[in-house]
Amino acid sequence: METAEIVKIAVSAAPYSIDKPYDYLVPPELLETAVPGVRVTVPFGRGNRTSEGIILTRTPGEKMQGLKPLLSVLDRGPVLDGDGIALALWLRQRYFCTLFEAVKAILPAGLWYQIREVWHVAEGMDRCAADGAATGIRRAAPVLDALFAAGGSAELSVLEEACGKEAGTVLRALQKAGVTVCETAARRRIGDKSRRMVELAVSAEEAASLTEKRSSPQRREAVRLLAAEGRMSAAEVCYFTGVSMAALRGMEKAGIVAFSAEEELRLPDLTAVEPSGPIVLNEEQEAAFQCIRTLTKTGKPEAVLLQGVTGSGKTQVYLRLVQEILSRGRRAMVLVPEIVLTPQMMRRFSACFGDQVAMLHSSLRMTERYDQWKRIRRGEVQVVLGTRSAIFAPLKNVGLIVLDEEQESSYQSENPPRYHTRDVAKYLCARDKSTLVLGSATPAVETAWNAEHGIYHKALLRQRYNRQALPEVLVADLKQEIRAGNAGMVGQVLRTELEENLRRGEQSILLLNRRGSNRYLLCGECGHVPECPRCSVALTYHSANGRLMCHYCGHSERSSDTCPVCGGIMKHVGTGTQKVEEELHDLFPGTEVLRMDADTAAGRHEQLLDKFEREQIPILLGTQMVAKGLDFPQVTLVGVLAADLSLYVDNYRAAERTFSLLTQVVGRAGRGGSAGRAVIQTYTPENDVIQCAARQDYQGFYEREIRMRQLRRFPPFADLFTFTVSGTEEGAVLRAAVAVREELRRLCALPELAAGEPEVLGPAPAPVMKLNNRYRYRCLLVGKNDRPTREAVSWLLKAFANDRANRGMNLFVDCNSME
């Protein structure tokens, strides 16, 4: 029996339905470089199309007939180690993605290769000879037409566009017949940057002697500089001495200097910060710190909820914990939910830990993210600070992971793998026996439930750091504004408070709560909002058919212009920041308003916030990004323009999100020496969520919400699997969704699933039913996220993809989606 080296490969071209580690043969010329963790190119599928992959394992084995060989190795060394490969396998099993999708999530985007196949007509082959050799090859003529029309050479993508997807199969058949040849090239999106360095190749005395007589003054000056400074960049030598690069090359030929290349890291521009003094904690912070510090010493994986009111100084506790972890020779990771929060947090951490901190988030240039990743991988940093994807940073010996504002939905990925950062952090802490700190003033209901039942530990910060009182909150009834004939977004109560702040010269923040852009109906008299009788979520208004629909169970009813409760007029709710900005300019002529939303703030978050603080602009108007983590001492007033916009959307998390958002934004006021005030404008002032937020009463909100979730079997009492079917023909998509529902019901009757009393709902239109010309319907499985359920879900996804009736349609699944 002949033996050989066999590798298992995660192949990029493998869809989920056939995804697995594929076996390939290592050819003799690649034995030294084909090791686990390197990217490779491989032939894949019947047409042996060149595809990218990554080696997962390598073992000696039997050389089986038909086993395909690797084509090439793309990396000089592994880009994933054993821990990274294990994480990719876990992501695949947990989130129903392919192995390669998991690997791509872990590695930085700039590291990926673009595989290009260029096809040529074989040397000496004219069209007549090509036609003769291609006899019997199906559809060879149009492919040859396109190839010869392109001058005898073209990329596969160009030929596929002209002749269809089967062009690759035809070209390979022509290759076997000797008509065509293929040239494959792998090009990385970004490369390493280096700079040319120069140094003396001989002693300073000898160099001076060689340049003393016949050399120019610039050459002699270059020798003196290099003798004094040692190795320098060639550009610097030219700049300081006036010597030309050509002259330096001449000195190299003469043996006086030597050139070399040195890696140059592309690091983000950060505002310089002064080193901070000792971190001083108050009594309450010290108690929380000591509680968590004790957990970090157990040598076991631990999770703790650090719950503190807004302004209580949770960041100070994070800093002290990181300091403690670093003193023990371990490393730390601190994550924030929004890019807008990273600059302020980065300044505070850099002041404490200097260049030991690396920052990772999507607003950095791809080259900057890649170079930060390299620093982390080489062990040059001790602390990683970033947004969601920073959880995959290759940081070793991690002793602490912090998720600030852990309740935020931005911690969940919307693309495969659809992971939640909190779950990945728990996996890493279990692997590394480290501590996970979940920080929030308004923790997710599931997190609070886990802390209440002893699954997580809990530390509390009940007071603000400076002992300042929480802001006084006024709840303004917008129904009164309608009755008074005020159709604008700024009511009389808020207008009065803004006038007072302008008179005092203090700053204000206004939040337009635009989350959940779906329109809903609301009675302008009594505040009634039509809800689904089955799901306890607000019904969404569809203007196309004039109906109210539930996007969970599919319930539908005709909309009415009159309120079924009091007979009042039903109002369509929804607006935008630009309109509010215009209204503010009309109300307060000459007052500067800084608008910050997804459009105006793209890539400019830090500049806008710096301008607000530095220039003392009176009013900052924005969406959710102004609600969290910002600390401006001169802000004494916060206004919420329409609290209801996120409260009445068809999502079981609507109440939790609204309470969290209101609590967070109210907490932006009064963080300096002056008392803070807040105005919450709402059409439903008596709503329990609004009232709890006005009182900053998390416990009251939690007790109400947990009762509702237990009644409805929402998390944490069950897990919700959302199956979304999409396609270009609505009727076909709906039929496929019905088939998915029936298959789910059959699976739920199996003994291993039936014990959990699963329930199947739907199909119903997705909240955005048509996206990119694809219709979307979804079904819900209410059950338990355990191994039998995940295996059943995986089987269903593969069966759907392999069913020819579903050609042109996609099915994907989320578990406990935040959206």
Where do the language-model regions lie?
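Extracytoplasmic/periplasmic
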Residues: 731-746
